[in-house]
């Protein structure tokens, strides 16, 4: 892995960090440039100061005793110029018109959590087409070994967060595959242009050069998008019917019906008939006849036509994909003239007649069950209908089984920090019981019926002999009891370990259990702010703990701050955040969590930290429609505003934006003093001031101050005193955040300070984080790499495990939680327990109530027992190299 990294010499030795007495930070760290990176000079002793000075001159920055190491060019955003420019070429390959295998398959994004629209894979021997790319598509495909690198085209049935939330991550992943990177054609209605404009703020333009928008058309005829020897794919634009008082269509209203038509299968060539009856000798003329061309007989003065020597052709199958999001769309669908040629009746059951074999309905159940939609479905008498829209069916069986298995194991070991996931309620309702239909391999009888879609359900198109429904790939359902039985069989002593953990909440037993060395090292002095703290004060739910891109076991960054009846906050919002909320709280509980969001804070513009934001905002706007409420405040880096402004042309996001640099301590002080908002990135005296040269950006101080006042009001209403952003070292405009609770009265009536929480975002360890974390109650710090991979941490401006802990130790933090692990550590990262006495590692869906914070480090050794048989690196982690390439694309 080290050998493949750009800018680093093959034989880099492990970095040696020198102690510094003059700095509050325990490490002596200095900036470096990848172009001149040399460990021998970078970490030279004081006797080789001349070489350090030469290095500083090259970097254009000064070094001091309290400087720190980071990748300067990456932090400034200039490292992109060091990378080889990629020209993402479209794949070209020889097609196979016969296509021995062809099928349509349901990819179950959104099937258990209803957070996105389902995706559909149209598979051929040499081509792959995907319809819709909702959030979680990559994660689902990784788990089920569906190679995204084989995808040729992506079609969107609508352009919105529900159908395209996973598209940015998909494009970034494909851009990082292979030597040059790959690109696909992305098709969608005219609204696709708005989405492309929005994504330009954080996705390289090269990754989007093959986006294709279409319609609306002046004619009712289908718009042909793809027409080759394999398949013809056409689009029919669907606009909602509006009443006269309605203002008309708006962006995001357009929907598409996709018509996929396979070519006919030619009849069998009758060699004997051609030779003996029509006098055509074997040779090139046989091929011409089979390709549909007439030829002259070699023995008679006649013209021989293909129909003379070939059996009857079989019509090619037809598949429709219908996304009808509202009943207004359904009314338009019912009256579409362009679909009339595809309708069938009982009188048309002639052998060899062409008809629609399968319709995959992406429409929600509220629409498909309406009288209008049901009447439209009855126009297809020979068609298999697959209902793939949102239905409350099989809800208790998660589609991401790998991560669900880990969640169930953690819940058994420590339910206090890992409550039962929302998809495994204690009692199942009738509508969550699995479909009793047997999983026979395939059935082609009685196509004129409707069935509910399931994960990986197929409709076989070819071979003709097995055309029809195929359930052979549907995964077996997974229940929590099965996972627990499996766990007890593998690790019998885990039952005793679970009982031991329960005793941490037993006050009387806690007096004796401290005798264990590990536990005795934990800080047992409870901070005043946690004295008699109520369980409904604050709970931290870590929704995603992985870096770069979603994996089988870890989703990307998101932290939900639950203030219970007062409201909630969200810190970062990577792809799939809504799905994770629904896995934690259940469908209805997650909706309530989204409703009560008052502020969303985003650390930086990298895609793994914000591409789930639009889906959350759009859903909140929908849930609160018609209810008196205030817009949610989004605090983020300035480039994020460009994305949100462009995206709002598609969906109503109902939000108010505030730049992170307007929420620094200096800006808040300016608000209090009646001055102007501060726009500088680093505080006076920071060593970073000599490194970063930021051009001033004009700010409308009146609007900033107004938004700051609104944020201050929101904080007061939810029981918080401060939300303060501080700059960190990762990429341009990267931030961490401090959140402070309001004062409260303790058990003896005294006013005591509220708790203080700090989140680092993505960052190298730096003095700004140490200062911001001073005496914090809890620090959540990224720990992307294990200690042995310091070179990679430096090159990518991330932290190692020990570096993150050292930040917390230098700041006298009470508890440290490590997160944002490289996906090379699929289940549990490499850790050294010797220096983690007040630290714990995070897992997806981990819930830390402030009343339990004192117990947190005590459970860490038990995690190692739980995962003792697991490999440190996972063979199926979609290649660690992909993690690195994705990071480069960002």
Curated annotation (Swiss-Prot):
Q: Per its UniProt entry, what is the enzyme's top EC class, as one word?
A: hydrolase
Its name, as the record gives it, is tRNase Z TRZ3, mitochondrial
Matching HAMAP family, A to Z? Answer: RNase_Z_BN (MF_01818)
Q: Which reaction does it catalyse?
A: Endonucleolytic cleavage of RNA, removing extra 3' nucleotides from tRNA precursor, generating 3' termini of tRNAs. A 3'-hydroxy group is left at the tRNA terminus and a 5'-phosphoryl group is left at the trailer molecule
First and last residues of the transit peptide: 1-44
Q: What keywords would UniProt list here?
A: Calcium, Endonuclease, Hydrolase, Magnesium, Manganese, Metal-binding, Mitochondrion, Nuclease, Nucleus, Transit peptide, tRNA processing, Zinc
Q: What family is it from?
A: Belongs to the RNase Z family.
Q: Upon deletion of the gene, what happens?
A: No visible phenotype due to the redundancy with TRZ4. Trz3 and trz4 double mutants are lethal.
Origin species, per record, is Arabidopsis thaliana (Mouse-ear cress)
- What GO terms in the biological process aspect are recorded for it? tRNA 3'-end processing
Function, as annotated, reads: Zinc phosphodiesterase, which displays tRNA 3'-processing endonuclease activity. Involved in tRNA maturation, by removing a 3'-trailer from precursor tRNA. Can process the mitochondrial tRNA-like structures (t-elements). Involved in the processing of small nucleolar RNAs (snoRNAs).
List locations, semicolon-separated.
Mitochondrion; Nucleus
Q: Which cofactor does it need?
A: Zn(2+); Ca(2+); Mn(2+); Mg(2+)
Q: Where is this region: Disordered?
A: 46-67
The record, for SUPFAM superfamilies, names: Metallo-hydrolase/oxidoreductase (SSF56281)
One Pfam family from the UniProt entry? Lactamase_B_4
